[in-house]
Amino acid sequence: MKNILRKIIHIDMDCYFAAVEMRDFPELRGKPIAVGGRSDRRGVISTCNYEARAFGVRSAMASGYALKLCPDLILVPGRMSVYKEVSAQIRDIFARYTDLIEPLSLDEAYLDVTECKQCQGSATLIAQAIRQEIFEVTGLTASAGIAPVKFLAKVASDLNKPNGQYVITPDMISSFITTLPLTKIPGVGKVTGKKLEDIGLTTCGELQAYPKSELIERFGKFGKILIERAQGIDERAISPHRERKSVGVETTLAKDIYTLEQCHGVMPQLIQELGARMSRSAKGRSINKQVVKLKFNDFKQTTIEHRSDEMSVKLFYELLAQSLERQQGRGIRLLGVSVGLACQADSNTAKDNQVRESQLDLGF
């Protein structure tokens, strides 16, 4: 397989929500802070600054547990309207350099600068310029990864944080990828990482030597993706109009619940809100599955899904009942429902996919 090599920049804002709060409220600087819900309402941390991370505080951690790790932690309520406003400023900066922008969230995006003529066409210099402009306009710092393919750019953006950047040039891919932990590959979480470790695979180099047929047999379609990523191959183009893949709603409960009847008391509001969100953000889109998610009081979670072409309230309740079979006496602290959205043809990637290594002057 011939790799599609481009000049990809992955921009990742540093502690974004927390950084905005420290910018707007200077008295918070130098103190451990986290943006998230109150502990007495069983809130969850959205993000935290580096001072808090030094105590082990992390995103998606229960606020109460975070306070046990860091008793002096300052919990700040989120201001989503402000974060969205600043994110729009950042995207305006991206647009000065390329139209090929794929936002991943408010604080993260891929940029394809292959055709950009600014900064002598150097992706490294373009990333530096973008980061400098972000700081001048917003007062916030960003980190960047520069590479010929998307997933390596994302990996690279994490290697010189905060307020730094890392470059992986085409001739570096082979040596860089050999020692890269498989857990750095997007999609390889704790469960898949453990499965790979159980067969003796922890690095991309080790996976390269493993029989491809066995990987595909064990991991199916994702096995093929693993084989490609372990060789530094990622043919995905930047998708400026990236389709939403799912719509969901969940709630963290004020108190643990334990029975199916108690869950039934929560479901109607969730399903109603899901329908409203579908109308707002996925109107006209077909669905391909329904999902129910539970998080227990030991913070482990389970999801059950079923293929579905049309949203069915009855199916949500059936999936809920199946989910509770995994409860094992644990209290339920979070309940969620979601739908997967069927893909639509994306005509914007065809032109981008025509760019091949032989056609590029890759000045990194």
Swiss-Prot record:
Catalytic activity of the protein: DNA(n) + a 2'-deoxyribonucleoside 5'-triphosphate = DNA(n+1) + diphosphate
Binding site residues for Mg(2+): 12, 107
Cofactor: binding comment: Binds 2 magnesium ions per subunit.
Single Gene Ontology MF annotation: damaged DNA binding
GO biological process entries: DNA-templated DNA replication; error-prone translesion synthesis; SOS response
Cellular component, GO annotation: cytosol
Cellular localisation: Cytoplasm
Keyword Cytoplasm: yes
Broad class of the protein's primary localization: cytoplasm
Catalytic residues identified in the record: 108
Residue intervals of the UmuC domain: 8-189
EC top class named in words: transferase
Origin: domain of life: Bacteria
UniProt-listed InterPro entries: DNA/RNA_pol_sf (IPR043502), DNA_pol_Y-fam_lit_finger_sf (IPR036775), DNA_pol_Y-fam_little_finger (IPR017961), DNA_polymerase-Y (IPR050116), DNApol_IV (IPR022880), IMS_HHH_1 (IPR053848), Rev_trsase/Diguanyl_cyclase (IPR043128), UmuC (IPR001126)
Recorded family membership: Belongs to the DNA polymerase type-Y family.
Subunit structure of this chain's protein: Monomer.
NCBIfam families: PRK02406.1
Name this protein carries in UniProt: DNA polymerase IV
Annotated organism of origin: Shewanella woodyi (strain ATCC 51908 / MS32)
